[in-house]
Amino acid sequence: MKQGSRSEGARGDIRGYIQKTGERNLYRIKKGLVPNMNVEGHMYVNDKLKHLIDDEIEMYQLNRNSTFLPAVVQIANVSTLPGIVKASIALPDVHAGYGFSIGNVAAFDMSNEKAIISPGGVGFDINCGVRLIRTNLFYEDIKDKQDELAQLLFNNIPVGVGSQGCILCNQDKLDEALCLGMDWCVKEGYAWVEDKLNCEDNGRSFYADSNYVSVRAKKRGITQMGTLGAGNHYAEIQIVDEIYDKRSAKLMGIEKKNQVCIMIHSGSRGLGHQIATDALIEMEKSMTKYKIDVIDKQLACTPIHSKEGQNYLKAMGSACNFAWINRSSMTFLARQTFAKIFNQSPDDLDMHVIYDISHNIAKMEDHLVDGKMKKLLVHRKGSTRAFPPFHPAVPLDYQYCGQPILIGGTMGTYSYVLTGTDKAMETTFGSTCHGAGRALSRNKSRNTLNYMDVLQKMKEENISIRVASPKLIMEEAPESYKNVSEVVNTCHEAGISNKCFRLKPVAVIKG
């Protein structure tokens, strides 16, 4: 297949290759949809969400000369990559992305010398993720201060595309930070020791080596530490709206409805984007060297154990550390904000991190494949780790309930906390959904939604909102996304994650 031809490959009526299985909410994408599939695709979607998948397919089939590829074709394309095992997996928030769809999980056998690593399987915002902080406050404590809290958070947390961070950082400090992750934050006084214990990988990637991060990437990152960014990134003040699993919620410090939490969704900013861009350029060159031919040039990749593959892992690990520092820095700012308004210390307010999780990452993990334990490189792009109770990677506090999974909703809608399951380990490489997933493009949202209508809806829901860029009001409106409750329910019914509790926003801060 000629590299660069994005609309070739899918054969006939795509829907003929999608088959419902006997498992709840699980479809097969059969081999043959595109040439040279090594494994089939697995897609988790319920009846209410499947029409969005069908809409993407119909748009593609009406205009095959377009550069647009629907998520189903992208899932099939990923299955052609060298070294992939079991299946290319689509989760219910899946939608078209760069090379890999967003909401895709793909794992590659590290014992296979041809197995690859691909920046498209991680995404440009490396270690984009979510952090949830609890408090001992309840809605009654904040309802008269809701607008004041929203404004002070907006003032304290730098937002927007060109925002600059509050953490002054020189080149030496940045290099140290990129290698140490949250350990650097603890050392510098921006995080508590216990914060990192309830963080995926303890907030530090040991792949990281800042020597493999370009000067340009460092230049973009040095001013952005502790910044929210724009797009779908946010900081929200939320209240617990529903508790489904009281035992697990209690382990997370959540015991009653209306308890106040803070959710932060952000990533590695310009540094991560530049690392991804640099890697894609290098990998496009290296594919000729390693005789790799991809069905779509956006799937640029290289063998995991090659020099280029190892260089990307080290740079990607550095971006992961930057993102954990970024969310930790904003946690520091959120704690300061609450301390000022309530005239109590963050410790007195019980502002502890419940968990921090990534949904754009590639990681070496052990998984059972065809009855054998194998070391795999698991790519999760727009998908979240979902490890079960008693897994060694799950923090001590959560050994009995499984790993907390933080699912951010859309502006003005619910967010969820889930827990990991054994079924996820068996079927999805210990993975589940990450959020709502876009239903409308940003351009379509701007053209079809009304700014004032969206604001009025937020007002009716008694949600305070602060946003740096007005166009984001339409782009990030709930109508632009899939129904997050349907996404979460699909995964719960399929058994790949369990619902624990639901959160409702009362204040939203966006770039």
UniProtKB/Swiss-Prot annotation:
Under Gene Ontology molecular function, one entry of this record is: metal ion binding
Q: Which residues bind Mn(2+) 1?
A: 125, 128, 233
Question: Keyword annotations for this protein?
Answer: GTP-binding, Ligase, Manganese, Metal-binding, Nucleotide-binding, tRNA processing
Give binding positions for GMP: 232-236, 359-360, 408-411, 415, 434-437, 510
The entry's Mn(2+) 2-binding residues are: 128, 265, 359
Record field: catalytic activity = a 3'-end 3'-phospho-ribonucleotide-RNA + a 5'-end dephospho-ribonucleoside-RNA + GTP = a ribonucleotidyl-ribonucleotide-RNA + GMP + diphosphate; a 3'-end 2',3'-cyclophospho-ribonucleotide-RNA + a 5'-end dephospho-ribonucleoside-RNA + GTP + H2O = a ribonucleotidyl-ribonucleotide-RNA + GMP + diphosphate + H(+)
The UniProt entry, under InterPro entries, shows:
RtcB, RtcB-like_sf, RtcB_euk
Cofactor(s) recorded for this entry are: Mn(2+)
Query: What are the BP-aspect GO terms?
Result: tRNA splicing, via endonucleolytic cleavage and ligation
Active site positions:
434 (gmp-histidine intermediate)
- Cofactor: record remark: Binds 2 manganese ions per subunit.
Q: EC number(s) per UniProt?
A: 6.5.1.8
Q: Does the keyword Protein transport apply?
A: no
Q: Can you supply one Gene Ontology CC term for this chain's record? A: tRNA-splicing ligase complex
Q: What class of enzyme is it?
A: ligase
The record describes its quaternary structure and partners as: Catalytic component of the tRNA-splicing ligase complex.
- Which family does the UniProt entry place this protein in? Belongs to the RtcB family.
Role according to the record: Catalytic subunit of the tRNA-splicing ligase complex that acts by directly joining spliced tRNA halves to mature-sized tRNAs by incorporating the precursor-derived splice junction phosphate into the mature tRNA as a canonical 3',5'-phosphodiester. May act as an RNA ligase with broad substrate specificity, and may function toward other RNAs.
Q: Extra info from the record?
A: Ligation probably proceeds through 3 nucleotidyl transfer steps, with 2',3'-cyclic phosphate termini being hydrolyzed to 3'-P termini in a step that precedes 3'-P activation with GMP. In the first nucleotidyl transfer step, RTCB reacts with GTP to form a covalent RTCB-histidine-GMP intermediate with release of PPi; in the second step, the GMP moiety is transferred to the RNA 3'-P; in the third step, the 5'-OH from the opposite RNA strand attacks the activated 3'-P to form a 3',5'-phosphodiester bond and release GMP.
Give the protein's recorded name. Answer: RNA-splicing ligase RtcB homolog
Q: Which organism is it from?
A: Plasmodium knowlesi (strain H)
